[in-house]
Structure formats: C-alpha cells, structure tokens
Curated annotation (Swiss-Prot):
Domain Pyruvate carboxyltransferase: 4-266
Region (Regulatory domain): 391-514
Entry's localization field: Cytoplasm
Any single Gene Ontology cellular-component annotation: cytoplasm
Protein name: 2-isopropylmalate synthase
Sequence positions that bind Mn(2+): D13, H201, H203, N237
Subunit structure: Homodimer.
Gene that encodes the chain: leuA
Length: 514
C-alpha cells in the first residue's frame, strides 16, 4: 500500500484566512498538536515575510522533533537565506520555494519571459541545495499553465536538485479529471520524475479541493498539502482530515494510507477552531458536530439495529468521545495536573498553579467540569502571554423588557489607570460594546460576533469570538466565561489588545529594517 505524506500548511496558508492572526504561543500550540496528529511536514510560515514569522518558524523548528518543519520562500536568495537561519536547527530542515508559471502570472505579476522564469527557478533550487537536504519546488498557478512549458520547467528544477515537485491549484480552478491528467502528463513527459515526489496543493474556490487531492493520489501523487478544517485564503484549502479519513475508509479503492493518528483529528480540529476563531460548520464532514447525528426516523432505526447501515465512520475513529465529567470541586491539584497532561498540554508549575485557581473558581459555580471546560481554561489563560494594553476589571449591565439596556465597564490601561464608562444600546451586547468603545476612546468597528457553548447544560461556559477593525486593520479575539456578556467583553478587549500587539510588532520590524 502506498504511503502518502501529509504536508500541513495550517500555520502558513491557513493563517492567511481573513481576520486570523495567531501569536507565537498559539502557533507553537498548534504545531505541537500537529506533531501529535502525525503529519509528516509542517509548513510553519514565511520566514522572510516578517520578524514575527521568522521567530515563529524558528521556534517551531526548534520545538518539533517527530516531523519535518519547512518554510516558504520566493525564488530570491535573501528569502532562502532567511529560511535557512530559521530552520537550520530543525530535526529535518527543508525548503519550499516557488515561482509562478502561468502565462497570466508571468506577464502581469512577474513581468518575466518564460525563459527568465525557468532560469530563476533553476538558480533558486541550486542555491537552496547548498543549505537544505530537501528542497520542494512549487509552480504557482500550475493548473493554468501551458503543460509543455510546465513539463520543461519541472524537468529543469529536478536536474537542479529539487526533491519534491508541487503542482498547486492556486485559484481552485481545476476539476478532478483535469488535475489528475496534469500529473499523468508530467509522469509521461518529464525525465527523472520517478526520482522525486509529486505533491498536490488544492484550493477550494469551486468546492473541489478534497476531490482534486484524491484525484492527484490516483494519478501518482505521494504528498498532499492542506489545512486543518480546510481553512485558508478565500474559500480555503483541502481539509487534511477529510483526505486522511477518505483514504482510510476507502483504502480498498485508493490503496494508499497516511501515518496520521486519526484519533487526534477531533482534538486538532477543535484547537485550530478555538485559536483562529473560525467555527467549524455543524455539517462539516468528519469534524462537524452533526457529522455523526441522525435526525431521520428511518436512519435512527437503522443505526440502532446496526450502525453500519448509515454510519460509515465511527465517531471514535476520529477521536469524538462523550463529554463525560472528569473533575469536580473536590478534585486536587495532582488530579488536575494529570488530566491536563492526558489532554496533551505541557504546563509549567506556575501555569498549573494559576490555572488551578481558575479551575476551583469555575468548579464552585459549575457542577460538572468537562475536558472542553479545561481546554477552554487553558487556551484562555496560557496562550495570551503578551503584554495587555487594556485589562477588563468589571462589567455591570442592566436590562429589562421595558427598559433601555445600560452597561457600565471598568478597565485598567497599560499604566494601571482605571477607566470607567457607561453607555446604552438597543440590546445588552450593544450597550456593553458602546461602553467599551467610549472607555477605549477608539473608533473600533465590530465586524463579526459569534457565540458557542463549551459543553452542554444550563451551566455551560460561553465562548465568544469577535472580529474588529480599527484604521483599516483587523484582529480577532475570543473570550470565555459562564456569563455571555462577560465572555463578550473579554473577546472585545482581547481583539483590541491583539491589534495593538500586531501594530507594535510592525513598528519594531520597520525600525529594525532602517
């Protein structure tokens, strides 16, 4: 059975989703979980793009040991140099270098002739091989490229030393049969192609990213690129969990397999969703909350008699478990620490102590403490280690059916000064956000507001995700609390703080570049 490598680009292509801004600690947490999931390659970022990206790629390369870490690079020597500096301490450093090959990109974006593109591609691969034992070369917009030219440039970069050739459907344009035909054409018309690995990278603009990826495997691809939950620029990328489970369930047809630990899929999906603020649709294949739900009476009857009548995937296969109680208010520090370790999180003693206080506070208010509750606490506390410009001290909201909703908020700024403001609104959340905007004295615009429960029951935690903009800059934030309004206020302040952090990092990068 053929082995298919999984190349995860959640931290690079996935982070290009509108409104998603992950900090270093969040990227590290996702990278560790991807390692537990068992992906073969993690594309950690674009080292030359910014100081923040460089630091994240470097930190991930130094942390992850059970899979290869790579970074993206243009066909520019300075990009390749930056990538090597970021990746050189990794367990298996590799480079992903690209250049566009379609007529429209060469003419309008690169303003280069086909001959110049070939020369640049070859030079970049040769230069990269001085540093990297493994070099992956990508033909950006390959699916709108002239096939004879694509074959020519692929042959040249293989001669220059490329180990992996990636054929991206950059704009999600191709159909499964056409995509498979491209791989077949290259296998027939490129010398020495049997010496390298062929990779597929599909976008979902026409909803065919997973189908195209599977078609590429049928045509000989041995590496699939994608993201967790299919997140990414525009309509997203191929969802890794869908490709992997499809290969597992239909191994009779594809005769191919991955090394993924499928039971880590649900946990990985939930982590990425929580940190990016991109909620998984209920009907999403494999990881949506309705993926294993049966509403029809006929279906329910069949499943009760024999699960395989309608259930081709067992929930346990991908790590979906009943949300049972794990801890309570009488649980001690040792049990608390042990359960966190079992969930896959590594915490310092100081972090354990700080979280234990929050856990005890929650346990006094909430009867059953579930794994989802614990994970929400960890993410809420552990990952936001940067300096907060504003801190939420308290909120008070008055609301009645015949009253105008009124909110009072108290904040503390970065210098420790208290700020108190009050405002009204058409509803409780609007009153609260109007008060926060007055306190901040900033023209913050709310672009998106979403809420979901953590666990079930009337005492479930509320998790709120918001996206805000200020001066044409966007940032997302999240907040968790038993009270919806408190969670809403936390999410708003979290987003504003992140916006200031992002802006501060850009200023530092600009100064460093001078």
């Amino acid at each position: 059975m053929r082995k298919i490598n999984i190349f995860d680009t959640t931290l690079r292509d996935g982070e290009q989703s509108a409104g998603v801004n992950l900090n270093l600690h969040e990227k590290l947490e996702i990278a560790r979980q991807l390692e537990r999931l068992g992906v073969d390659i993690i594309e950690a970022g674009f080292p030359a793009a910014s100081k923040g990206d460089f630091q994240a790629v470097q930190a991930i390369a130094q942390t992850v040991r059970n899979c290869s870490v790579t970074g993206l690079s243009r066909s520019v020597q300075s990009d390749i140099d930056a990538a090597w500096e970021a990746l050189k301490d990794g367990a298996e450093p590799r480079l992903h270098v690209f250049i566009a090959t379609s007529p429209i990109h060469m003419q309008y974006k690169l303003r280069m002739t086909p001959e110049q593109v070939v020369e640049t591609a070859v030079e970049s691969v040769r230069y990269a091989k001085k540093y990297f034992p493994i070099v992956q070369w990508s033909a950006e917009d390959a699916c709108r490229s002239d096939l004879p030219f694509l074959a020519t440039i692929v042959e040249k970069v293989i001669e220059a030393g490329a180990n992996v050739i990636n054929i991206p459907d950059t704009v999600g344009y191709i159909t499964p049969k056409q995509y498979g035909d491209i791989f077949s054409f290259l296998k027939k018309n490129v010398r020495n192609i049997e010496k390298i690995s062929l990779s597929a990278h599909c976008h979902d603009d026409l909803g065919m990213a997973v189908a195209n990826s599977l078609a590429a495997i049928e045509a000989g691809a041995t590496q699939i690129e994608g993201t967790i939950n299919g997140i990414g620029e525009r309509a997203g990328n191929a969802a890794i969990e869908e490709v992997a489970v499809a290969l597992y369930i239909r191994k009779d047809y594809y005769q191919a397999e991955t090394r993924l630990n499928l039971q880590e899929i649900k946990r990985t999906s939930s982590l990425v969703s929580k940190l990016t603020g991109m909620i998984v649709p209920a009907n999403k294949a494999i990881v949506g909350k309705n993926a294993f739900a049966h509403e029809s009476g006929i279906h329910q009857d069949g499943v009760l008699k024999e699960k395989t009548t309608y259930e081709i995937i067992s929930p346990q296969l991908v790590g979906v478990q009943s949300n049972s109680m794990v801890l309570g208010k009488h649980s001690g520090r040792h049990a608390f620490r042990t359960r966190i370790q079992e969930l896959g999180y590594s915490l310092t003693e100081e972090e354990v102590n700080r979280l234990f206080v929050r856990f005890k506070d929650l346990a006094d208010k909430k009867k059953d403490i579930t794994d989802d509750d614990l994970i929400a606490l960890i993410l809420d506390e552990k990952l936001d280690t940067y300096k907060n410009f504003y801190q939420l001290c308290s909120i008070q909201v008055q609301y009645g059916t015949n009253q105008i909703p009124t909110a009072v908020v108290v904040l503390k700024d970065g210098e420790g000064n208290d700020i108190q403001e009050a405002a009204t609104g058409a509803g409780s959340v609007e009153a609260l956000y109007n008060a926060l905007e007055k306190a901040l004295q900033l023209p913050v615009t709310l672009l998106d507001y979403r809420i979901e429960s953590v666990g079930s029951g009337r005492d479930a935690l509320a998790q709120v995700y918001v996206k805000v903009s200020l001066d044409r800059k966007e940032a997302s934030g999240r907040g968790t609390a038993q009270d919806v309004l408190e969670a809403s206020a936390k999410a708003y302040i979290h987003a504003v703080n992140r916006m200031f952090v992002i802006e501060k990092m850009k200023e530092e990068q600009a100064l460093a570049a001078q």
